[in-house]
From Swiss-Prot:
PANTHER family: EQUILIBRATIVE NUCLEOSIDE TRANSPORTER, EQUILIBRATIVE NUCLEOSIDE TRANSPORTER 1. Keywords: Cell membrane, Glycoprotein, Membrane, Phosphoprotein, Transmembrane, Transmembrane helix, Transport. It comes from Mus musculus (Mouse). GO terms for molecular function: adenine transmembrane transporter activity; cytidine transmembrane transporter activity; guanine transmembrane transporter activity; neurotransmitter transmembrane transporter activity; nucleoside transmembrane transporter activity; purine nucleoside transmembrane transporter activity; pyrimidine- and adenosine-specific:sodium symporter activity; uracil transmembrane transporter activity. The record marks C418 as: Essential for nucleobase transport. It comes from the Eukaryota. This is Equilibrative nucleoside transporter 1. The keyword Iron does not apply. NCBIfam families: 2a57.
């Protein structure tokens, strides 16, 4: 058995598998965030979501329009979003960083399958708890523990997938990014359907969690099928040295096992390598990928700084009392963003301009800073109740919709380009490590964006 020929990705099977895996990394967490109103409702001491029809209707309205106030908010409910952000971003950043350094010590299959199974278990528990009543404090603590677990395993899963895609051709990072973009689209559609149906918030949340479980199971099945494809085995073998052992290794790979000697043979320092050599290797990779790494960090810093902290606070100037008032944020903000973000991510499958060494790439990335004043000068409601804003420049809904479309498309396209280019700027043996480091900088951008969002919202 040899690898002298270069097999084709028959029926785009590997591309589709990575697409589903990308979908599986973000869809569960997106559904979790979409159900935020369900969690805050259960923490309100004066109401129970499932016991009062009128309050359920108010909850559904709140899902559509964040300005609708829920009665008698508890202190736990009031701090839920802030604590959720903290419990999400810190593990995401920490575990992505750890994965960048420790992926040589833990096999790829353990990291990916273990993470998917852990996320599946958390969502099964979350779905079951929808039907269980408990004290608000206990529910709050359990929810935060679940958020930490989801984002910890999600960070390991995402970084491992980008590292795995790094050993394949450059355009195989694109399906991961595209799948993640589609995850946002699905959750936006689910949110709009929940509003239109008028269903109770607890029922909508249960549907979100069960759907997330189904997607994770599909991702597990796809990952198990990946080693059976000749295309994947071929490119994985290219990262292994020692032609005399190729046949044995390919047999192991076909069974879904990772060759024991992969770490040492791939040129990536193993667990017993001197720390100095390992550090020098990582420093060399960082130097090679610094431009795409810093670019993807900057992209997500700007994006998360504005979306949704600022953009979700924009009000329609033409809705009045029409139904558009309830649908404005779900459609003009969330659905609009997720559709164009997905289109931008997907475009890299057929177009990768500018090139990985072009100066235009960092220039285009830096130019996205213009969206900060553009979106902040839209019809954003005042931070304090009763306060009036007088410095609207782009008050009409059309301005906001157009800016959001360009904002989202540039985010998806440029971020996907950077994630594709990063692993291709190093030797093939270092591609997996480069992919993990790129994932770390992506998560760093998310964390910095979360911090920036507080500042930008305070300035409105």
């Amino acid at each position: 058995m040899t690898t002298s020929h270069q097999p084709q990705d028959r029926y785009k099977a590997v591309w589709l598998i990575f697409f589903v895996l990308g979908l599986g990394t973000l869809l569960p967490w997106n559904f979790f965030m979409t159900a935020t109103k369900y969690f805050t409702n259960r923490l309100d001491v004066s109401q129970n979501v499932s016991s009062d029809t009128d309050q359920s209707c108010e909850s559904t309205k709140a899902l559509a329009d964040p300005t609708v106030a829920l009665p008698a908010r508890s202190s736990l409910s009031a701090i839920f979003n802030n604590v959720m952000t903290l419990c999400a971003m810190l593990p995401l950043l920490v575990f992505t960083c750890l994965n960048s350094f420790l992926h040589q010590r833990i096999s790829q299959s353990v990291r990916i399958l273990g993470s998917l199974l852990a996320i599946l278990l958390v969502f099964l528990v979350t779905a079951a708890l929808v039907k269980v009543e408990m004290d608000a404090l206990i529910f709050f603590v359990i929810t935060m523990i679940k958020i930490v677990l989801i984002n910890s395993f999600g960070a390991i899963l995402q970084a491992s997938l980008f590292g795995l895609a790094g050993v394949l051709p450059a355009n195989y990072t694109a399906p991961i990014m595209s799948g993640q973009g589609l995850a946002g689209f699905f959750t936006s559609v689910a949110m709009i359907c929940a509003i239109a149906s008028g269903s109770e918030l607890s029922e909508s949340a249960f549907g979100y969690f069960i759907t997330a479980c189904a997607v994770v199971i599909l991702a597990i099945l796809c990952y198990l099928a990946l080693p059976r494809t000749e295309f994947y085995r071929h490119y994985l073998q290219l990262n292994l040295a020692g032609p005399a052992e190729q046949e044995t290794k390919l047999d192991l790979i076909s069974k879904g096992e990772e060759p024991k000697g992969r770490r040492e043979e791939s040129g990536v320092p193993g667990p017993n390598s001197p720390p100095t050599n390992r550090n020098q290797s990582i420093k060399a990779i960082l130097k090679s990928i610094c431009v795409p790494a810093l670019s993807v960090c900057f992209i997500f810093t700007v994006t998360i700084g504005l979306f949704p902290a600022v953009t979700a606070e924009v009000e329609s100037s033409i809705a009045g009392t029409s139904p558009w008032k309830s649908y404005f944020i779900p459609v003009a903000c969330f659905l609009n963003f997720n559709v164009f973000d997905w289109l931008g991510r997907s475009l890299t499958a057929v177009c990768m301009w500018p090139g990985q060494d072009s100066r235009w790439l960092p220039v285009l990335v830096a130019s996205r800073i213009v969206f900060i004043p553009l979106l902040m000068l839209c019809n954003v409601k005042a931070r304090h109740c009763g306060a009036q804003r007088h410095h609207f420049v782009f008050k009409h809904d059309a301005w906001f919709i157009a800016f959001m479309a360009a904002f989202a498309f540039s985010n998806g396209y440029l971020a996907s380009l950077c994630m594709c280019f990063g692993p291709k700027k190093v030797k093939p043996a270092e591609a997996e490590t480069a992919g993990n480091i790129m994932s770390f900088f992506l998560c760093l951008g998310l964390a910095l964006g979360a911090v920036l969002s507080f500042l930008l919202r305070a300035l409105v």
